[in-house]
């Protein structure tokens, strides 16, 4: 309080501020930075959160746009991302961010030399979001999703799940569906081949083991829906179907659901042969080999080992 008011700080004022804000640092800072000597502090304390609302309403459209974009992200946002999404001059943008920081709306930090911004308090973010229209929020989510998609370098579960979140919130059901399948396939690769004991994270899009088959059924239903709508490329859907069947077959073989797993592998072979997808054919024969190992059938192992080597050709020499 002394830092902001400099003078005129007396015990009654301190008690009045504490009673009005409950000692909430956010409300204290917003209240103190909004006082210009002419305002009645009693009126301000009647609805302390209105201070934030009034402060937001006084911002320029450009400054408000920055807050809207940052509100789409879960945490901190780098200055480079803001520059790319808002297509503003870097000097103009840094000036606006500094202005928002002085207003107590944003906080600034540096991570390994990267300048980042986030809301000074979650309550400010909540108020910003509450003032957005559904249309604006969907457009912002789509813009963020499209940007992250173009910048994607590492295929990780976290990167896929971030894309799923933004595409879903933006209303692009097909892109969300696509990354659900790719995320599931990557999870299957880790869990059922490389790290059999790995579990999905708490916030993962991948469901718990006991709900996995239902999840596969939902994705197959979505695939059928997209095919019937004819809005998406059939070639893209064919590729996603192969990835989905491959992930589901690995889950079934790994967990001893052999009848369903083998049926899926047979479907895979048919689809891959029709599309002349040699790389996936080889992977499918490898799944048959894993199946043969699990049930101690050397004839199955030998059969699919030979078929796989034939597809590989000279590469196995």
Regions found by a protein language model. Give the residues of each.
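A short, hydrophobic/aromatic-rich structural module that often spans a beta strand
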Residues: 79-80, 235-280
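The tetratricopeptide repeat
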Residues: 77, 140, 159-162, 179, ...
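Helix-turn-helix repeat elements of alpha-solenoid scaffolds
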Residues: 98, 135-142, 155-160, 194-196, ...
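Short helix-adjacent coil turns
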Residues: 74, 158, 171, 191, ...
């Amino acid at each position: 309080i002394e830092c902001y008011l400099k003078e005129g700080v007396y015990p009654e004022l301190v008690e009045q501020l504490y009673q009005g804000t409950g000692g909430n640092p956010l409300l204290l800072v917003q209240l103190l930075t909004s006082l210009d000597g002419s305002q009645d502090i009693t009126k301000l304390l009647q609805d302390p959160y209105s201070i934030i609302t009034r402060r937001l309403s006084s911002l320029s459209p450009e400054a408000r746009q920055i807050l809207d974009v940052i509100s789409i992200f879960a945490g901190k946002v780098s200055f480079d991302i803001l520059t790319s999404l808002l297509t503003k001059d870097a000097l103009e943008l840094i000036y606006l961010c500094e202005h928002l920081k002085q207003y107590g709306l944003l906080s600034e930090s540096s991570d390994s030399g990267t300048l980042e911004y986030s809301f000074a308090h979650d309550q400010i973010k909540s108020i910003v979001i509450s003032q957005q229209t559904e249309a604006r929020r969907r457009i912002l989510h789509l813009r963020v999703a499209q940007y992250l998609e173009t910048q994607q370098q590492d295929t990780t579960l976290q990167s896929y799940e971030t894309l799923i979140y933004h595409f879903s919130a933006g209303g692009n059901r097909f892109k969300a569906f696509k990354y659900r399948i790719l995320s599931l396939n990557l999870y299957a690769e880790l869990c059922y081949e490389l790290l059999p004991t790995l579990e999905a994270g708490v916030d993962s899009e991948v469901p718990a083991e006991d709900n996995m088959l239902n999840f596969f059924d939902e994705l197959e239903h979505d695939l059928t829906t997209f095919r019937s709508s004819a809005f998406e490329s059939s070639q893209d859907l064919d590729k996603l179907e192969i990835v989905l069947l491959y992930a589901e077959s690995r889950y079934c073989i790994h967990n001893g659901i052999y009848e369903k797993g083998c049926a899926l592998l047979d479907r895979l072979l048919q689809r891959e042969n029709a599309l002349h997808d040699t790389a996936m054919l080889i992977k499918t024969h490898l799944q048959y080999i894993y199946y043969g190992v699990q049930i101690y059938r050397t004839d199955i192992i030998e059969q699919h080992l030979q078929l796989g080597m034939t597809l590989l050709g000279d590469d196995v020499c």
